[in-house]
């Protein structure tokens, strides 16, 4: 899957169980949540400017490894830098890797939900 534009990002995130979208901060920052917790944030104006990026949750050790390995991955902008990375598109992160990082973020957040909420989400029809 290639995420070339905001529509494809939207469809990729929405294809996961229990995902909802929100604008909790301002009308520019699109936030995807699972079970009421954020796993992906992006700025709509940055997409329009051609400089899109995502804020994604990441395992703290892996986050450090990724930042060392990729120029386009930095500590999370306006987020806990231990648990979040900012990943820029059009850099040295492949589309496949971008999808893996979104999946990793979703899984981390999903696993942090209560068993009851996890079960409710798994029972949803997608």
Feature roles, as predicted:
Residues 1-126:
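Charge-dense, helix-prone N-terminal extensions
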């Amino acid at each position: 899957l290639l995420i070339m534009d905001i529509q494809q990002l939207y469809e990729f995130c929405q294809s996961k169980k229990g995902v909802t979208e929100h604008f909790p901060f301002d009308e520019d920052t699109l936030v995807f949540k699972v079970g009421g917790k954020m796993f992906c944030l992006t700025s709509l104006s940055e997409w329009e400017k051609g400089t899109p990026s995502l804020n994604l949750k990441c395992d703290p050790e892996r986050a450090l490894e990724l930042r060392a390995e990729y120029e386009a991955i930095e500590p999370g902008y306006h987020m806990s830098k231990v648990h979040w990375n900012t990943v820029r598109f059009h850099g040295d992160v492949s589309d496949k890797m971008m999808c893996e990082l979104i999946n990793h973020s979703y899984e981390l957040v999903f696993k942090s939900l209560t068993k009851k909420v996890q079960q409710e989400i798994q029972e949803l029809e997608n």
